[in-house]
Curated annotation (Swiss-Prot):
The gene is pksS. It comes from Bacillus subtilis (strain 168). InterPro entries: Cyt_P450, Cyt_P450_B, Cyt_P450_CS, Cyt_P450_sf. Belongs to the cytochrome P450 family. The lineage of its organism: Bacteria, Bacillati, Bacillota, Bacilli, Bacillales. Pathway: Antibiotic biosynthesis; bacillaene biosynthesis. This is Polyketide biosynthesis cytochrome P450 PksS.
């Protein structure tokens, strides 16, 4: 039998990560591999079964903070140059107590009331986008709806002026590109993003507005505030993790519904099922297909596998969400599925702070789309669908549809 070897940048994984991860889940659920990145090689582990993923997400022997296991020279090789190292200094890259402090400060600007107050605005944005789509019989869901909706929402939430949003979109697209060949373009986008955010932070310190940046700048607890670098990191995290995962949910979720006509019809007839439908789309599509940036802080043995200090840990979210030992008929989309304990938003102290916003956008977007265009159909062969090049985030390049029969 051919020895399994995980290639995160390989064509097979890019085309269908669920199939690749599923094979590891069945044959080698705890898989050691060598990660080649930016000219260096790192020992790593791929975890693919639900119970094992949960165990590693809970394990205190696993750190999110690379500084706990690597020196500055190693970090520089793995990551990016010092002027943009804020990308690895956000709260998802911290353990307690640093994580607790950061999350507490950020939560002040991201309360449930803040999110719920966005409902009317999100509904209005969705309807305006659908109005534009209605002018034609065909559309690209990604270009016309799935990408602009969360982008406009996050831009308004942050207080990004309308005249700056096209450039902001360019930076965002570049920052989520994980292909090694585009490293310098990504780094340049990060530098420009940082310079732009620095100006906004400066303005909000002097003259606060009713936006997220102002709230983050002025958030305080026990005399502690977010530093300049922490502000860059948090806003980077918000844009990359918050924006792209929602774009992926809306795009891949629409594709999943169009490919499962019975479930799509069920949702059209019973829009009150939207909450369970969105949870199932989160499970089935896994907008974050894999979580990385975790390291063992000490040597330990797990189920007979010898894990060494400094080993990288990859959590196969997309595989855990389709584990037949945990989900009944996991390869089938079932919008009635309940309970649905997917881990698309992570687990524990690093559970996604933006989950309520992503869910709200999903509820509004799918209901509005299916109500406006009940006859929407896929306008391209499934094999011709193009996926974005990102090892960790699963998203579509485009999704051509016909809007009426």
């Amino acid at each position: 039998m051919e020895k399994l070897m995980f290639h995160p940048h390989g064509k097979e994984f890019h085309h269908n990560p669920f199939s690749v991860l599923g094979r590891f889940r069945e044959e080698e659920p705890i898989h050691r591999f060598e990660l080649k990145r930016f000219g260096a090689t790192y020992p790593a582990w791929l975890i693919t079964r639900y119970d094992d993923c949960m165990a590693f997400l809970k394990d205190n022997r696993i750190t999110r903070d690379v500084k706990n296991v690597m020196n500055q020279e190693q970090i520089k090789m793995l990551n990016v140059s010092e002027d943009i190292d804020f990308v690895s200094d956000h709260m998802l890259a911290k353990d307690t107590p640093d994580h607790t402090r950061l999350r507490s400060l950020v939560h002040q600007a991201f309360t449930p009331r803040t999110i719920e107050n966005l409902r009317g605005s999100i509904e209005q944005i969705a309807e305006q986008l659908l109005d534009e789509m209605e002018k034609e019989n065909k559309a690209d869901i990604m270009k016309s709806f799935a990408s602009p909706l969360p982008f406009i929402v996050i831009s308004e939430l942050m207080g990004i002026p309308k005249e700056d949003r096209s450039q902001f979109q360019i930076w965002t697209n570049a920052m989520v590109d994980t292909s090694e060949g585009n490293r310098e373009l990504t780094n340049q986008a990060l530098r420009e993003f940082k310079d732009y955010i620095a100006k906004l932070i400066h303005d909000r310190r002097i003259k606060p507005k009713d936006d997220l940046i102002s709230k983050l700048v002025h958030a305080e607890e026990n005399g502690s505030k977010l530093s300049e670098k922490e502000l860059y990191s948090m806003l980077f995290l918000l844009v990359v993790a918050g924006l792209e995962t929602t774009v992926n949910l809306l795009g891949s979720g629409t594709l999943a519904l169009l490919q499962h006509k019975k479930e799509c019809e069920k949702l059209k007839q019973q829009p009150e099922m939207i909450a369970t439908a969105v949870e199932e789309l989160l499970r089935y599509t896994s907008p974050v297909v894999m979580m990385a940036n975790r390291w063992a802080i000490e040597d330990f043995t797990y189920k007979g596998h010898s894990i060494k200090r400094g080993d990288m840990i990859f959590i196969g979210i997309g595989s855990a969400n389709r584990d037949p030992n945990f989900f009944e008929n996991p390869e089938i989309l079932n919008i009635n599925r309940s309970p649905n304990r997917h881990i698309s938003f992570g687990f524990g102290i690093h559970f996604c702070l933006g989950a309520p916003l992503a869910r709200l956008e999903g509820h509004i977007a799918f209901k509005a789309l299916l109500k406006r265009f009940p006859d929407i159909e896929l306008a391209v062969a499934p094999d011709d669908i193009q996926w974005r090049k990102n090892v960790f985030l699963r998203g579509l390049e485009s999704l051509p549809v016909s809007l009426s029969k």
